[in-house]
Amino acid sequence: MSTLVHSLSLPGPRLVRAEILKLRRRRGLLAIVAAATVGASVVAYGILAILHAANPGHHGPAGGVLNLGHGMFVLSLLGSVAAIFIGATAGAGDLGAGVFRELAVTGRARSALFRARIPGGLAFLLSFVAAAYALAATASVVFAGYRTVPSPGLLAGAGAWLLLSCAFWFALALGLASLVGSRSTVIGALLAFELAVTPILASIPALGSGREVLPEVALTRLAPHAVRGLASNGGVVPASLGTAELVLVVWALALLALGEWRTVTRSA
């Protein structure tokens, strides 16, 4: 069995656990991710609850479908930031720390070293995202008041979409960082692309269907209809479901393939 795994260049459990441990040991990264996910959820719904308690006539309840959508916007935006930090760190962290050479000469397949970063990074990231969403989902129901209470189907769909969104940005950051070899460059480039470039391009009607190739536009298309307009960062652009799925798959697989290729061919 171990021979088969090695021949397929699949990462073993030890490699995956090692990747998770490397990420956990970065205290600064841990603080950023916790603040951008769990911290953001607590602060957002805490403020809404305090405002409602202080002036219920002016500020509505903190829960309901409406504020679930607002919460999804906050968590998808900050969760993607956390995903980019984790992906860039997983992809270029060994190079930055000067330990890539030691890993490359251990005899393990380089492709397995790269692929171990995918489940390792996702396990680290999605545990925080899931905890943050659990808080948001609970608050949207408990604090709904007179607002419409989210249905179980909506809560499940919104949670799955949030996990997908964060996992997608992690994959892009991991692949690009492995290709470029610079953590800071990738973080800066992807944050600028997601937070500045994408909203501008998505708001230009003259681009027409060309906007469908933007990752954020494709992700928005996959969001549950009840919160789609509220959770959008790149604007709601008409697109078919199949096109949106294809765009995300091509972006993720292309950058991951390039990242793995560079990891395998990089000079130690």
Region roles according to the model:
Residues S2-S9, L29-A90, F114-R183, L191-A206, ...:
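Secretory targeting signals
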Residues K22, A92, L103-V105, A173, ...:
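Helix-capping/transition residues at the boundaries of transmembrane alpha-helices
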Residues I84-T106, R110-S111, I118:
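Transmembrane helix boundary and interhelical loop/hinge segments in multi-pass membrane proteins
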Residues A218-L222, E245-A254:
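Small-residue-rich transmembrane alpha-helices that serve as helix-helix interface/gating elements
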